[in-house]
Amino acid sequence: MPNLMDDAAMWDFVVDGYTVVHADLAREFHAQIHRDTEAVFAERGNVGNAILAEVPALAEVFDHSAVRGALTSILGPGYRFYPHRHCHLNTPHSAAQAMHLDSYEADENNRHHRARWALAFYYPHDVDEGMGPTSVVPRAQYHSTRPPDDETLFTGEAGSVCIVHYDSWHRATANLSDTPRYMHKWLFIRTEEPREPSWDHSPSFAPDYPATADLGSRDHGDMWANVWNWHCGREWEAKEDGGRVADLCVALSADLETVRLNAAYALGRMGGRAVAPLVDTLRDEAERRLEGNLAASMTNPSHLYSGYALSAVGGPAVPALTDELESDTWSIRAAAANILGDIGVAAEYAAPALAKRLGDAEPWVRRNAAEALGHLGGGAGEVVRGLGGLLADDVEWVRLNAAVALTRIGGEAAGAVPALESALDDDAYYVRANAAHALDAIGSPSAGGAL
């Protein structure tokens, strides 16, 4: 049985972006993984995704009840391995890395605040502060600009596993020792939107968070509360009047990202009263920020602060966003698709409109619509046919997102099996690998044969 997190630990994850657990297997077990890892590096160098085939005992670490419990708590009971893993070697007397966010492999994902992706960092040997441990910046996982380097070092004995929100700022620190430091990094994804807490939750638990009175504060109380409610499978109730809407919409373009984020979630607090002015702001921001977003690395053109606000509004924003899927401007269509997917359960009835956008002339719209349909779930024929068709798209990251969406839909996506079987021969590794994962998730006899 997975050892689930309790409310306090889950709240800490929502706020800080990481949690540490221990796979308390025998020390000799971890020592053998360490020796096997060293042997792979000595004989073949860094084998990237093939490390599991070279060191199959790694699977037992991530199947440990403490690790499964934390991942279940954060990503839900249907979470899956993502087909990306990497062993990081920090050589003796090496310099520290720059603080960074990881890219999404072969994709330009939106950096959603809601935890649908997580990284796990595992040490097969003891790691102290002098050995170049990985560090994480607490409370920075919702920031796309580099925060102050108030980092926390992840140290611990063999078997220590740090699970982090995918968009956490992190780095390898300087290895001041004579000992090589190994860290196995694995990636996991959520396959089901939360409808209830997936951790050891008590209905009486009430998170203690500060009200966001100062838009420049790094205490993002409204944001944390919104993410917490999403994990609990509920939307928050609108609590503020609409008197500040205009000023807050202006603040979405402030120079300081903390101001933009706090303004977004203050607007989200206002519920339906904020939708019309936010949609106007979205139209402007989607065009105004387009050139910069396209030029930036690791950035989807729909990375918009009005988008975070509309996601936080939730259900009341769905009709207006569905209308924006018909915009003449592709960046607005792409943004609307992204936000509907981030809203999740409350936007499920927008699936037919999103399915129409799978045939959009603009690849960013197709990509965002495919991802959104994976979040919304449901295997309606038009959705599955559309996603299956995208597996032959000219653009790799469109095909990739179609395969991931079909993985999330799972058994209801059986109609896409022939297209998924063909995708097993795709030139792109992550398309092939995710097609195999989708076939496994479908679980039909024909899917098993394809695997």
Predicted regions and their residues:
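A structural signal for short, well-ordered beta-strand segments
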Residues: 85, 120-122, 184-188
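Conserved double-stranded beta-helix
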Residues: 144-163, 168, 173-272, 280
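Short, solvent-exposed loop/turn segments at secondary-structure junctions
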Residues: 26-28, 87-89, 104, 127-129, ...
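Structural detector for internal amphipathic alpha-helices that build alpha-solenoid repeat scaffolds
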Residues: 214-241, 258-273, 291-315, 323, ...
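Catalytic core of non-heme Fe(II) oxygenases with the double-stranded beta-helix
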Residues: 95-155
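Non-heme Fe(II)-dependent double-stranded beta-helix
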Residues: 1-110
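Amphipathic alpha-helical scaffolding segments comprising HEAT/armadillo-like alpha-solenoid repeats
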Residues: 240-253, 272-293, 315-326, 345-359, ...
